[in-house]
Amino acid sequence: MILFPAIDLKGGRCVRLVQGDMAQATVFGDDPAAQAERFERQGFSYLHMVDLDGAFAGKPQNAAAVEAVLARVKIPVQLGGGVRNLATVEAWLEKGVSRIIIGTAALRDPEFTRKAARLHPGKIAVGIDARDGRVAVEGWAETSDITAEELGRRFEDAGVAAIIYTDISRDGLLTGLNIEGTLALAGALKIPVIASGGLASLADVERLLQPDCAKLEGAITGRALYDGRLDPAAALELIARAKTAA
């Protein structure tokens, strides 16, 4: 299992939102690249980044901050936010992003998403953000009538590397992951699923290491790390021990 530390970008700074509300942004740092280096030193093996401004604008808005991170760390980076066309996908891959997350466009333009996955196998993830079981788009500002499972099934044979599933109702609240909902989605799809939204403690990491979570590729954590509620060393040690035992 991979534990992805999150860096969410707003105005070039590291922030965390509560339930996707840009008005409830807490700034945790002015130097995203320094934060990325810190995560790398702590032993994390893969970084999760979101251009929040880009998600709302429909095109990248924090390119300088992302490029600074790519220049400073060696660990792979997955990036989402404002990815709506192939030109954006290819520009980020050329700059060194390891995996691109397509969110809103997966619902609005599924053919683009499938084409991106075909052209760049293993490099495209679909971000499915759900509110009360329904997919939310445009930086979570709009909720559709499509369920997470329905959207995921559209990409079963497209070559998508992963589904990143976020329960918006828990995001940024440190109330624990929606394990039941995440496992239900993972059980319905062939694509590996990454859990996001609410991971708050070492107990959540332990839960993710149980046998019934074996299909999950990993989980994303943000606020718990910034608030000091989750000890990176303890979490990564737990994961390493579980891997050795397996």
UniProtKB/Swiss-Prot annotation:
This is 1-(5-phosphoribosyl)-5-[(5-phosphoribosylamino)methylideneamino] imidazole-4-carboxamide isomerase. SUPFAM superfamilies: Ribulose-phoshate binding barrel (SSF51366). Keywords: Amino-acid biosynthesis, Cytoplasm, Histidine biosynthesis, Isomerase. GO terms for molecular function: 1-(5-phosphoribosyl)-5-[(5-phosphoribosylamino)methylideneamino]imidazole-4-carboxamide isomerase activity. One of its GO terms (biological process) is L-histidine biosynthetic process. The keyword Isomerase applies. It is found in: Cytoplasm. It holds the Pfam family His_biosynth. The active site is at D8 (proton acceptor), D129 (proton donor). The lineage of its organism: Bacteria, Pseudomonadati, Pseudomonadota, Alphaproteobacteria, Hyphomicrobiales.
